[in-house]
Amino acid sequence: MASKKSSPKKSSAKIKPWTMSMPDDQFERMRQILAAPSPIGLEAAMSTGVIEPMMREYMPDGWAIHRFKGHAGLVLDTHPGDTSRPSIMLIGHADKIRMQVRSISEDGKIYINTDSFLPNVIVGHEVLLFSEEPEKPGNWRRIEGGTIEAIGAIHFSEPSQRSGDKGLSPDSIYLELQMHGEKAKKRLEKLGVKAGDPIILNRPIKRGFSPDTYYGAYLDNGLGCFMVTELGRLLAESPLKNLRVLLSIATHEEIGRFGAAALAGDFKPDVLIGTDVGHDYLAAPNLGAKRMNPEAMGKGFALTVGSIVTPYLNQLIMEACQKAEIPVQTSVVGRDTGTDAMGAALAGFDCVATSIGFPIRNMHTISETGHTADILGALHGMFTSLHFMDAMNKGKGITREDFKKNHPRLDLTKRLESGW
């Protein structure tokens, strides 16, 4: 389908943006957010560098943006300081999994930690290395033109590696900066390259071959941050009357959801909704035999079931999305959602929670792949759900008591007969 030139202003019964191609201007905003260099612990490029200016562009008077001391998270608050309203926090995380400099060899090879990347899938790809100026700590620079390598050439590999029986050892992975000549290590150290310096993949997203698809690095989880940012845009045009919304950009998710726990602990929202990527299980090689729940990209966003998820909140989201004819898939989890939805539980306070996801392919690679319909479905699904809850109780909005008294009672269930 051909792309439109401008973004739709809001959901409606007649216009269904989740059934249409993402407009070019909206896709460009998504590309900018995902392209921000924001490795774990250094997320300000995305949060304050890209997202905050976007939020300030549309936020009305009376809204506020909160920043924090110990992390680069961000919260756009529709009703700052108003604790009388039920509050709903939606969180995406800005941190990207990264590699780190481990050591520098005499010939200039920079051996690295691969973190959450499978070594085999990063070899040969271009990366960005960030380091501080030795004489001016805090003055960060970037080195472009490097690639991740391992054994140097197939000619130097072991027979078992050539046959595919053996993979690459994480400690064999290094950054190639094409260094040659004398004192290669000292020249790199003089530039400021040192142990611990972050390295990230360098491939901004592009539209894919198939309609409404896209691919590139770090859909995990620029997508959640993009969705949260765009949700604020819709709410600015069609505000809620009774609810306080906290549109949040978290940090440190990839190493334990610590940013979400800090944000949730600060604001203590009544409701927390984590937004993150999920898996397209139908397209995942060798997973069909495991009989996974058939999530697939292009079929809509996924609503999580299990772990700390509050059933009544899921019920409300499903009711709202069914009424608006927004497709919703199911993501089944066990003891942990694996997302920032765990923030309140980790912070240790009472909170309604759920998690939504966007099924993607090739997670934690340079070619993560998604479908714009899933993002648009999640965006308008959350927008519709917020307005649905805002209109409850004859227009007075959902209350904290509604959540307290609507926990499912399985002891009151009726026996189901086959009926055939």
Question: Where are each of the predicted segments found?
Answer:
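N-terminal hydrophobic/helix-forming segments and targeting peptides
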Residues: 1-420
